[in-house]
């Protein structure tokens, strides 16, 4: 049985924090691969302006192209309508029946888990993995983890890694203000952002 991670997000743009999380998940969970899945039309961000999905996909693809154990999927980009996690997990479970899936997400999603569509199905289709994010205390995170585990009778895996205080929002604002982002994003992403004149 293979073990693969699904790392979903808007990746607008992908940054060094995303890569750090993916590497940590890969080795701490002993995964065979980590699949980055840029969201097509995330239901929790319908009121926000998001960069074209194909551009976000290309950013991720270019950044990870030489990483043997990373890949990117355009599954959510090809599907019309809102990008629900249960649909994505169902697709990958049906397509790869020899694989045990680990869904990797942040503390912010853990705090909103009750509002997710078909959350019972989500938790039954994967091992749900949560990493810390800035702005969320360890105490609050562990309380929510325990509450969710009791409510849905499912185990949540806590990925114990240092908090990387980088956000795509901060990066977009820095670009808009003509500030240096070279220490926040991979070189390939930075070059593509400049070439396409993104986030200005």
Swiss-Prot record:
Top-level enzyme category: transferase
Top-rank taxon, per record: Bacteria
Pathway info: Cofactor biosynthesis; NAD(+) biosynthesis; deamido-NAD(+) from nicotinate D-ribonucleotide: step 1/1
GO MF term (any one): nicotinate-nucleotide adenylyltransferase activity
EC number: 2.7.7.18
Residues making up the signal peptide according to the UniProt record: none
One biological process term in Gene Ontology: NAD biosynthetic process
Keywords: ATP-binding, NAD, Nucleotide-binding, Nucleotidyltransferase, Pyridine nucleotide biosynthesis, Transferase
Alphabetized InterPro entries for the sequence: Cyt_trans-like, NadD/NMNAT, Rossmann-like_a/b/a_fold
Keyword match DNA repair: no
Family per record: Belongs to the NadD family.
Identification of the protein by name: Probable nicotinate-nucleotide adenylyltransferase
Natural source organism: Clostridium novyi (strain NT)
């Amino acid at each position: 049985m293979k073990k693969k991670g699904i790392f979903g997000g808007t990746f607008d743009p992908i940054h060094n924090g995303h890569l750090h999380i993916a590497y940590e998940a890969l080795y701490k969970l002993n995964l065979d691969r980590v699949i980055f899945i840029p969201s097509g039309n995330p239901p929790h961000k319908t009121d926000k302006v998001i960069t074209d999905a194909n551009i976000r996909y290309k950013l991720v693809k270019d950044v990870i192209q030489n990483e043997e154990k990373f890949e990117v999927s355009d599954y959510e980009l090809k599907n019309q309508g809102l990008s629900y996690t249960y649909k994505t997990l169902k697709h990958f479970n049906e397509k790869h029946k020899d694989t045990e899936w680990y869904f990797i997400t942040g503390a912010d999603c853990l705090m909103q888990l009750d509002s997710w569509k078909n959350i019972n199905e989500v938790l039954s289709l994967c091992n749900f993995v949560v990493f810390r994010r800035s702005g969320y205390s360890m105490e609050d995170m562990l309380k929510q983890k325990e509450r969710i585990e009791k409510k849905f009778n499912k185990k949540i895996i806590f990925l114990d890694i240092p908090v990387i205080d980088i956000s795509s929002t901060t990066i977009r604002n820095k670009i808009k203000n003509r500030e240096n982002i070279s220490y926040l994003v991979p070189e390939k992403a930075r070059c593509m952002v400049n070439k396409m004149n993104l986030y200005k």
